[in-house]
Design a protein with these regions (language model features):
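Short linear motifs at protein or domain termini
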Residues: 1-97, 212-223
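Short helix-capping and inter-helix turn/linker motifs at the boundaries of alpha-helical repeat units
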Residues: 5, 173-174
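Conserved amphipathic alpha-helical segments that form helical-bundle/coiled-coil interaction surfaces
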Residues: 91, 96, 100-165, 177-186, ...
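Residue-level recognition of short, well-ordered coil/turn positions
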Residues: 22, 57, 121, 191-192
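A short, mixed-charge helix-start or loop-turn motif at secondary-structure junctions
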Residues: 1, 31, 72, 116-120, ...
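Mobile beta-alpha loop/short-helix "lid" or hinge segments that flank ligand
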Residues: 58-59, 152-157, 171
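Alpha-helix N-cap/N′ positions at the starts of helices
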Residues: 86, 175-178
Length: 223
């Protein structure tokens, strides 16, 4: 396999393990362990770690090794702070660029309760993909490439956080469905100011719930 392909393979596999929390936040990694686990040489692994450091997923310290970047309550608050700045702004200023067909599709989906009910972990995990697709649609409609690029970094961290706290998310699932419907109704009515305000409310409620879930996770893992 060509060297560039090996670098891509190493990057993809290590990144997936970090995002899925198989390599947990705060855990220590080293090149020897990674080369053995992936069946690759040091060069592609080292290259992958450099890329992951640029993404904020690992911290590389000379003579101390590699640490998977921790996810703290402060990090979570900062992620939601950025979302609160960007997503309502996009709706208010670029909402008219959103594809009406996709808005209608999402509206129909959020009107239908999950087959397994709101209290199941399976429904919660399925909601992650739906929620991610909905918010990605909004951000991708923004023509400002700098907003899209900076948002991409928090998407990765947000995905990692979701994996970390999946078991506790079911408590907020039903409310999230309702909040998404309210945002979508405003979008379909082309009331972008109202859509932006409902997005602010949704993001703030999500932030409060996320902080609670983080504390639950830390308590559970400390036991």
């Amino acid at each position: 396999m060509a060297g560039s392909n090996l670098k891509t393979l190493a990057y993809t596999q290590i990144r997936r393990k970090i995002v899925s929390c198989e390599y947990a936040p705060g855990s220590n990694l080293n090149e020897e362990m990674l080369t053995s686990a992936l069946g690759l040489s040091r060069t592609p692994v080292r290259d992958a770690l450099g890329r992951l450091e640029q993404e904020g997923l690992v911290e590389i310290r000379p003579k101390k090794g590699v640490t998977v970047t921790p996810l703290t309550v402060t990090d979570i608050n900062m992620i939601f702070e950025l979302r609160r700045l960007y997503e309502p702004f996009i709706l208010e200023n670029y909402g008219h660029l959103l594809p009406a067909e996709q808005l209608n599709e999402f509206y129909q989906i959020f009107q239908t309760p999950p087959e397994d009910g709101f209290e199941s972990e399976r429904s919660s995990l399925a909601f992650y993909d739906l929620d991610e697709a909905f918010h990605a649609m909004i951000v991708q409609s923004c023509p400002n490439v700098y907003i899209r690029r900076s948002y991409e970094m928090i998407r990765t961290q947000n995905e990692r956080f979701r994996h970390m706290t999946a078991a506790t998310y079911v408590k907020r699932l039903e409310d999230s469905y309702t909040e998404h419907l309210e945002i979508l109704r405003a979008c379909l009515a082309q009331d972008w100011k109202d859509a932006a305000e409902r997005m602010r409310i949704h993001i703030e409620k999500s932030r409060v719930a996320a902080v609670d879930r983080a504390f639950e996770y830390m308590k559970r893992t400390a036991e």
